């Protein structure tokens, strides 16, 4: 186990070194940028951006250079060097790191991927494509304008790593289209189940899965909106349904098919021909005395029971937990820039570091005591802090797992709480912890 964290770090360091050798692909001007020896060469800049947490920029530089007055550089020098780096480096680094690792955990031989999105608040800029204009509330009050990116992500819930991600300016939000673009680009060597919530299902969504090798879906649907579901009795059930999606409106009405206008094809909401036969399995189960959940899936009944479907959909919560850790442990809420390209750099840097930390933590084995009431697991918040310090070489290789296992917490299954939604704003540069 001790050598595993060193192996992960060597893999990431090796990828950074190899990509840095071809830095001309990732700089704004290959003829001028990073051609002379400076205090902040290309590879150092990359590791510095990867290692940043949520402090002020000066504090990040102070920590990175070991508090050595001969080594520390000014924030303006850092920004000047950063301007020369394309955000594409960090996007490619995220994918290259994933491609270099083998994440083995499966459920009945299937990879389990959750699909979701999360809004990311950034600094105010009324001229940016991320700007959301003031709107009137139900009370007639005018809100303030603000800026957001939307992170569309695919997350491996068993191996606890981000598999793919795409960014959109929040005003251009289209989660379904972003997911289908990622799905179409993915290579799936083994069977994979994608779990999604109510905002994702559409005829185009289902048709894409029909044509994608090794891709299966488990998706929650709205009882009142889905044509195949809304007339079903409100009881527990497990049935099959079939429809033909067609853009021939007249034929659709006469035959009882699911039809849509040709505008959907023109707008990119339909990726196939005029007709597509679609088959579904519809599962409905109770989640309380008065509430039911309705799931549509492509999984075969002989391999996956209703209990399996219920368990799979519950796994989707893993991506919600990951967003919280990504934002408030890794530091995605605390950016060090206003410029869009710098923000994209930091978002993909944080995704890479999240995966780096999780892959190390996954090898930590917590010894269970039969005399204890609960089973125990690693405290992921502290585990990630230790891994980030290890990346900065502030923690010795041999001490990583002994430190991680100092911080464990009880697993208390069955707990639930009402989700508390609160509006959040960008964390201003002048309101950062400098300790």
Mark where each language-model region is.
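Single, function-defining residue in the core of a domain
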Residues: 1-55, 63-64, 72, 77-85, ...
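Short Lys/Arg-enriched helix C-cap and helix-to-coil transition segments
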Residues: 89-104
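Conserved beta-strand elements of the Class I
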Residues: 111-113
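Short Pro/Gly-enriched beta-strand edge/turn motifs at strand-loop
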Residues: 132-138, 263-268
């Amino acid at each position: 186990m001790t050598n595993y964290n060193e192996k992960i770090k060597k893999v990431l360091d090796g990828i950074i070194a190899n990509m840095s050798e071809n830095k001309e692909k990732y700089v704004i001007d290959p003829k001028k940028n990073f051609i002379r020896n400076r205090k902040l060469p290309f590879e150092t800049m990359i590791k510095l951006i990867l290692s940043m947490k949520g402090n002020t920029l000066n504090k990040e530089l102070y920590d990175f250079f070991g508090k050595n007055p001969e080594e520390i550089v000014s924030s303006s020098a850092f920004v000047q060097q950063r301007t020369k780096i394309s955000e594409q480096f960090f996007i490619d680094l995220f994918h290259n790191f994933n491609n270099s690792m083998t994440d083995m955990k499966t459920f009945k031989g299937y990879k389990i991927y959750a699909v979701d999105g999360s809004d990311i608040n950034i600094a105010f800029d009324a001229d940016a494509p991320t700007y959301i204009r003031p709107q009137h509330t139900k009370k007639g009050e005018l809100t303030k304008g603000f800026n957001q990116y939307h992170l569309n992500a695919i997350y491996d819930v068993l191996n606890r790593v981000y598999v793919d991600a795409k960014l959109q300016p929040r005003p251009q939000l289209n989660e379904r289209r972003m997911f289908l673009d990622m799905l179409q680009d993915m290579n799936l060597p083994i069977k994979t189940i994608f779990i999604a919530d109510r905002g994702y299902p559409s005829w185009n969504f289902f048709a894409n899965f029909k044509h994608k090798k090794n891709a299966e879906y488990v998706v929650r649907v709205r009882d009142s909106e889905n044509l195949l579901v809304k007339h079903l009795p409100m009881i527990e059930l497990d049935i099959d349904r079939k429809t033909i999606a067609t853009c021939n409106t007249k034929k659709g009405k006469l035959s009882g098919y699911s039809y849509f206008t040709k505008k959907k094809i023109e707008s990119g909401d339909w990726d196939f021909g005029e007709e597509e036969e679609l088959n579904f399995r519809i599962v409905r189960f109770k989640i309380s005395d008065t509430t039911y959940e309705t799931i549509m899936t492509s999984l075969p009944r002989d391999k996956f029971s209703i209990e399996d479907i219920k368990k799979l959909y519950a796994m989707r919560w893993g991506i919600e937990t990951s967003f919280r850790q990504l934002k408030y442990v890794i530091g995605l809420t605390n950016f060090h820039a206003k410029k869009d390209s710098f923000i994209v750099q930091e978002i993909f840097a944080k995704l890479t570091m999240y995966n780096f930390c999780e892959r190390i933590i996954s090898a930590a084995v917590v010894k269970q005591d039969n005399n204890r009431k609960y089973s125990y697991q690693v405290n992921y918040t502290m585990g990630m802090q230790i891994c980030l310090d290890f990346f900065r070489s502030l923690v010795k290789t041999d001490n990583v797992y002994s430190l991680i296992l100092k911080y464990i917490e009880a697993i208390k299954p069955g707990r639930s709480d009402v989700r508390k939604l609160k509006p959040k704003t960008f964390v201003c540069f002048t309101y950062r912890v400098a300790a």
